[in-house]
Every structure is written in structure tokens, then in C-alpha cells.
From Swiss-Prot:
Its main location: nucleus. SMART domains: G_patch. PROSITE patterns: G_PATCH, ZF_C3H1. It comes from Drosophila mojavensis. Coiled coil: none annotated. A zinc finger (C3H1-type) spans 155-178. InterPro entries: G_patch_dom, Znf_CCCH. Keywords: DNA-binding, Metal-binding, Nucleus, Repressor, Transcription, Transcription regulation, Zinc, Zinc-finger. It is found in: Nucleus. The lineage of its organism: Eukaryota, Metazoa, Ecdysozoa, Arthropoda, Hexapoda. Transcription repressor. CDD domains: Tudor_ZGPAT. Residues 310-356 form the G-patch domain. This is Zinc finger CCCH-type with G patch domain-containing protein. Residues 41-61, 254-278, 410-433 are annotated as: Disordered.
Amino acid sequence: MDEYEAQLLVVKQALLVTSDEQQRDELIALQTNLEELLALTRGSEPEATSDTKTPETSDNIDDELQRFQSELIDLEHQQADPGEDQQRLEELRTKYNGLLGEKCSAPHEHSWGALSYHNALICGVDDELIVDKNGILDVRLRVLFTNPTHREMLPCNYFLEGECRFDEVRCRYSHGALVPGSSIKDYKAPDFHRLARNCSVLAKLQDRLWHRGRVLCVNFVEQQCRVRLDGQEHKERERDFPFEELFPLVTAEDDDLTSESEESNETDGSDAGNDSDMDDFEAARQARMVELSLFTFKPTERLGAWEQYTRGIGSKLMANMGYIHGTGLGSDGRGIVTPVSAQILPQGRSLDACMELREAANGDKDYFSVERKLKRAQRRQEAANEKAYERASKRTDVFAFLNTSVLGQGSQQTENANKKTKPNNLQQHSNKTLNVETVRIADDIRRKQRDIAKVQQSLARNATDAQLQKRLNVQLQAQKQELATLQAQETSLCKEQQTRKSKNKMFEF
């Protein structure tokens, strides 16, 4: 009893001297424990006199006494050697300053008491020493969580820019969490190869928080993933996320599988000869499959022609799975090479009738092939297009006559020959056709005149730019030449119309 009272007196004296808030909190807690222990000891004195005190109670009190004495010794040691504490603080600060800017995995205690580790970024070192649960001096680090799941973990944007007007206590967002340096773990990089159906992930939403969800499907080519978010508060539960906004969660089973794979890798690494043998075997298999694709494959059509309907996504997926172009499917490369062709049987005919039709065609397996029918229809359409083009090329209209006969740029002999063979093809057209062509040419002339006016305005506006002036002059000359061509065509049409009017007047009596 006297020892407890002496220890309580020492604690009270230490409270009067100590100014550090953390040490004062520890001393106050120690004072409370000592007072409770004294109260229990006074209450157990009658039982001790009557020999009813159990061995377990005495052992517990002795353990608590030893623990309190060790804590008092630590406090006295800290008060007695401030220089040593300062030296220890400098050593820890030097050690942790080299970790500034590094990624790590830091603990976070939620409001309901649960403790979980999250990826974070070390951004500072605290200036005060602390005593961890093992009684070892340590320093707290200030970390910012990179995948915040709750609002108290969300970093303050204004604090990162140095413009936050609130302190750490009043700000609704995080200015960095203080965690002991000994509790820091290695950074867990996201492993996107784990992404698969029903895989648990964290997905980043517009509120900058990472919400839990489960994977529905993964596209490793475009690096996108469809996730169904947990909880009923999300209006759109199923969304598409890029890989940059996802973080695959590692479960206990995945850790076990990873540890087993690491152990197997260590076992395999001890036998380098077996690895080299496996590599040689894989290389030989690849060479054999390439040989099969070069010497045994006799294509009847262009390899991969079916990809014109799929934008090439099929070949990309097969290449990611290890497929070698030109080889068959399967591990030995002896499967089919060309895709299975679709077959459409005649409507309303039985299977026996369809088999008879195929036998009548000498057993042609592709007799009902859709691709063959499409190719046959395509060839027919191409032949029809060629015939239509030939008919259109032989047909002579007013513009063809004006371009070739009246305003052609060929030699004089060609013009003379055209004049001998076709003295005036405009006479073959009706008055209605000539009137329509006259109106069209007049519209083209007005449009061309407007274009020339715009080019001239550009020349006047950009008089100082030599390169632009040169290009505009070339464009102006081309426009004027086209205008002259149109005016010549209009003159020819007007002359033909005037000739017809004169003939009509001559025949009138």
C-alpha cells in the first residue's frame, strides 16, 4: 500500500513538471489506474486478514504493479535524458525523411473502431517522439491515402495547393493522417491480371471516393471493365470503368494462392536445368506449329477475311491467348483454320430433300453456304454495274458534247475530226433539254462569279502575305478559266436556240 501511494505521489509531481500533452495524457491515465488499484487494495485488506484472497488476484495485482513500475521507469528515463531523446528523434527523422514521397500501405482506424490498411503517400514527418505499444521510441508519419473509401480519408485539394483556410481539426477533409512509422507496410500495386468475373474491386466515382463493387466482364484489349457497385444508393449500379479507376482487392484466398505460387516459384528456381528444358520444349513446339502453318495449310480464301465484319477484335483476342496465325486451333495446332461457314437450307424442304440436292451437286459441302451465295450475288452485281457503266459511257449528253467538241483541249486534228464526224450534236437534243441546260449553266455562272468575288476580296485583305497571294492568284486563274468555259457553253446553247427560232420563222407563212 505504501509503495502504491509513493508511486501515486511521483506521478502527481511529474504532472506538475511535464508540459508535453502526450506525456500528460499517459501520466493522467497512470494516475487513474493507481487510484483504482489503491481502492481495490484497501477493499481487499479484510479479505487478506481472513485468508480468503485467491492466488489469481494476487498474481494480477503483482503483474499490474510490475507494469506500472516499468512505465514509471520509462517516464523517469525520458525526463532524465532529454539529450538522448533528442538524438533519437534526429536519427528517426533522418531515417524517415528518405521516405518522403514514397508509396506505402498505412493503417486507418474507422469511426466504429475497425482498423484497415490502405495505399498511401508519405508526405511528412512529425516533430514529436512517441512510445509504441512495445515501449520503443518512434516517430509518426503524415500520409495521404491514394484510394480513399470514406470522407475522413479524402485529401483536401486546397491543402495540397497550400490555400486551405481551415486547420486540420476544422477542415472536413484530410490534411494527412498521422500513423506510427513502425506500422508502415510495403505498397501494394494494383494487379490488373486478377480482374475476372465476380472479382472484388474498388471503383473511383465522381465524388473522388473509391466504392466497392464486383466485376461483370473485362476487356483487356481496350483496358475497360464493367463493374456492379455494391449498395442501393447508386442510381446506375452497372458502369464501365477504365483500368486507371479500378483497384483489385486481394482476399485471403488470393493471398494463399499467391504464397503457394511464390513457394512453387522458389522450388522451381532451385532447379534451373528443368526451366531451361521447358523453355527448349516450348520453343520446339512453337517452331513445329509455324512449320505446320507454312507447309500444311492450303487456303482457299484470304486468311482472316472474316475480320472485316469484326474490326479485328477476334484476331487480337486470339493472339493474346497465344494463337499463331495460319495454324489450326488447339494446343497442337491441328484444328480448323478457317471458320465454320453458315448454311441456309431451302425453306419448306425436308432434310432428305436437301441431302438429295447436295448429292445432285456432286456432294458439294458448300452447296448451301451463305458466303458462296453472297459472293455469287456480288459477282452478278459487279457484272451488272459494268454493263450499266458501258451504256452510260456510250450515251452522249449536252455537257459531253460541249466538253469534247466545242471546248476540248486536244490537238487541232482531233477537233477537225470531231467536226467532220459530228458537225453539230446539239441538233440532236430537244428544245426542252436545251432550255434546262441553259438554266443550269446560268446558275453555275452566277455561282462561279460569287466565288471569284470572294477570292478577290481575300487578295485585297491579305496584300502583305506573299505566299497566300500566290495561292490565291492560282485559285483566281482557275476560277476565271472555269467561268470562261461556262460562258462559252452558254454562248453555244444560245446560238443553237437562236438558230432554231430563225428556222421556225422561215417556215411560217
